Amino acid sequence: MRNILFVGLGLIGGSLASNLKYHYSNFNILAYDSDYTQLDEALSIGIIDQKVNDYATAVEIADIIIFATPVEQTIKYLSELTNYNTKTHLIVTDTGSTKLTIQSFEKELLKHDIHLISGHPMAGSHKSGVLNAKKHLFENAYYILVFNEIENNEAATYLKKLLKPTLAKFIVTHANEHDFVTGIVSHVPHIIASILVHLSANHVKDHSLIEKLAAGGFRDITRIASSNAQMWKDITLNNQNHILSLLNEIKEQITGIENLIREQNSNSIYDFFVKAKDYRDQLPVKQHGAISTAYDLYVDIPDKPGMISQITNIISSHNISIINLKILEVREDIYGALQISFKSPEDRENAIKALANFDTYY
């Protein structure tokens, strides 16, 4: 029986472990975590076969290692991996949100017959910890795989086959492309959202109306500022070059719009907003792009026949109108697989009550 070792068993690691444990009986699922309570909880809910107290021993008996730890910790583990007497053709992957630094270990690890296929499952939840793990967390989510060396083709193919039961949508790309694109669509938006929140906080003492008015669209467009600060500190530092370059682009755009406003150049200001609207409106509806200011509700459901109709039937039976409905494929920053839009906050609140048996977020 082959051994899969999870290093880090929070929401992401726990959900992957839960999925593999459910779908495979020919693997022994081991887990190591610096928080021993996570391991005990994982054993109690049956998503792992064995908890590991001795990391070194576990690494040397593993056939596959999945590092589901913050980026900085993963980098440390990878830098020390060649110190151990690992099995031949060991496959190693991770779940981090930045790839350049992690993938820099690929060539050196290959010399020791260790095959690094870096991974980024773009799924998540506002809840953390292994007790919130869900085996269906990755359904319809994009799962990015990154490797450069042709010698790792076989390992990448094996890993995709192993993870097929997650029902994720796999994309293979290069580390630099991954970090640049995620810098645009994820990392910089997190920074901008936090800047907007700081702007609000800096003035709320003298302008108490801010808190009342911010409960609407402002709260929606800055939702991602509530993400885990430790994780985003690591991501920001590990994607430093791309983030700094993109922030410089934003500075140039801010300077440009400042000048247009100062000059009262109404045609160019109009074009500024129209071009943004036109580009955003043509983005694929099912792909998570810009943040909606509608009264959206996210429902965490497995991708099974009849689930969407079950949800909509419950809502309609309570005389609540739905104005839009979409299945999300990229879910790293959106909590839930199904996004439902309502015409009022009251309708959304009533839907939450009607869907009390489901995990709902907004």
UniProtKB/Swiss-Prot annotation:
Enzyme Commission number(s) of this protein: 1.3.1.12
Pathways involved: Amino-acid biosynthesis; L-tyrosine biosynthesis; (4-hydroxyphenyl)pyruvate from prephenate (NAD(+) route): step 1/1
ACT domain segment(s): 296-362
Top-level taxon of the source organism: Bacteria
Catalysed conversion reaction: prephenate + NAD(+) = 3-(4-hydroxyphenyl)pyruvate + CO2 + NADH
GO molecular function: NAD+ binding; prephenate dehydrogenase (NAD+) activity; prephenate dehydrogenase (NADP+) activity
Sorted UniProt keywords: Amino-acid biosynthesis, Aromatic amino acid biosynthesis, NAD, Oxidoreductase, Tyrosine biosynthesis
NCBIfam families: PRK06545.1-4 (NF005106), PRK06545.1-5 (NF005107)
The protein, known as: Prephenate dehydrogenase
Gene it is expressed from: tyrA
